[in-house]
């Protein structure tokens, strides 16, 4: 946006209400693949016992994802996306458009905020696992040498790597770190059986060092800090395979 764009208020749509909706990254990427100004899906707004329910259904021809992180893949994106409605919270939010001549036009006032979340089905769980697996791959890869290394190294009593490894092994109670993807699989499997776990039980299940396990848990879970499930862990909403009951005010 230009620093000194001209604001055009001619016919300003100050009474036009617009929605501000947060959507998953993969969904916006699939929308971008739609030809021209074609249809990307259907929005459904209904009333259920006086409450507004909104959901978005992605077109079937846009559900196929062929790459993740620039790497070839073959997975189906979730098609059903229920909305979580949120209040504007007393804020005044507006939407502007900018023309090629740097003119700004007021398009409307934000009257509703929402988050478009995927239904936690098998397609979505597989997509998230592939995304986590791709993001967990090391940037540096080992390379096989075709020549013998002849560089001479002076012998030392103990290498720094070994010293550090022994120190960590003592701190972690001699627990060895497993591959991250393997730990994720164990955690997802555990949370399919129960919604809540304390950290000690998850350590017993995965046999992983506490600090290492907590780092992985923070990626897929949240720790409850109050209520009857205080100090327990559960999956983030986007990873859950169950429906959370609505809490009464």
Swiss-Prot record:
Top-level taxon of the source organism: Eukaryota
Single GO term (MF): DNA binding
Principal location listed in the UniProt entry: nucleus
Modification type N-acetylalanine: residues: 2
In-chain residues carrying the UniProt-annotated modification N6-acetyllysine: 22, 33, 137
Record's keyword terms, sorted: Acetylation, DNA-binding, Nucleus, Phosphoprotein, Transcription, Transcription regulation
InterPro entries: TFIIF_beta, TFIIF_beta_HTH, TFIIF_beta_N, TFIIF_interaction, WH-like_DNA-bd_sf, WH_DNA-bd_sf
GO cellular component: transcription factor TFIIF complex
GO biological processes: transcription by RNA polymerase II; transcription initiation at RNA polymerase II promoter
Pfam families recorded: TFIIF_beta, TFIIF_beta_N
Keyword Phosphoprotein tagged: yes
Localization terms from the record: Nucleus
Residues bound to DNA: 227, 229
Coiled-coil ranges per UniProt: none
Modified residues (Phosphoserine): 142, 248
Biological role: TFIIF is a general transcription initiation factor that binds to RNA polymerase II and helps to recruit it to the initiation complex in collaboration with TFIIB.
Complex formation: Heterodimer of an alpha and a beta subunit. Interacts with HTATSF1 and GPBP1. Interacts with URI1. Interacts with GTF2B (via N-terminus); this interaction is inhibited in presence of GTF2F1.
Family statement drawn from the similarity comment of this UniProt entry: Belongs to the TFIIF beta subunit family.
Name listed for the protein in its UniProt record: General transcription factor IIF subunit 2
């Amino acid at each position: 946006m230009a620093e000194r764009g001209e604001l055009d208020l001619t016919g300003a749509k100050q009474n036009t209400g617009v929605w501000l909706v947060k959507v998953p990254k993969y969904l916006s990427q699939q929308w971008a693949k739609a030809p021209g100004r074609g249809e990307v899906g259907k929005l459904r707004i209904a009333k259920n016992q006086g409450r507004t329910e909104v959901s978005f259904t992605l077109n079937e021809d846009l559900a196929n994802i062929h790459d993740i992180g620039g790497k070839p893949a073959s997975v189906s994106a979730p098609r059903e996306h229920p909305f979580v409605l949120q209040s504007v919270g007393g804020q005044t939010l507006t939407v502007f458009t900018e023309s090629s001549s740097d003119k700004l036009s007021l398009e409307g006032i934000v009257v509703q905020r929402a988050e478009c979340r995927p239904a936690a089905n098998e397609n979505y769980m597989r997509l998230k696992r592939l995304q986590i697996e791709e993001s967990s791959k090391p940037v540096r890869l080992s390379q096989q040498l075709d020549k013998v290394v002849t560089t001479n190294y002076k012998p030392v009593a103990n290498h720094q790597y070994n010293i550090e490894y022994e120190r960590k092994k003592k701190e972690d109670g001699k627990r060895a770190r497993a591959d991250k993807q393997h730990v994720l699989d164990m955690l997802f499997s555990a949370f399919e059986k129960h919604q809540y776990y304390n950290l000690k039980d998850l350590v017993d299940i995965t046999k992983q060092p506490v600090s290492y396990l907590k780092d992985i848990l923070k990626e897929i879970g949240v720790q409850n800090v109050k209520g009857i499930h205080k100090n327990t862990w559960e999956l983030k909403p986007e990873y859950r395979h169950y429906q959370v009951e609505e809490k009464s005010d």
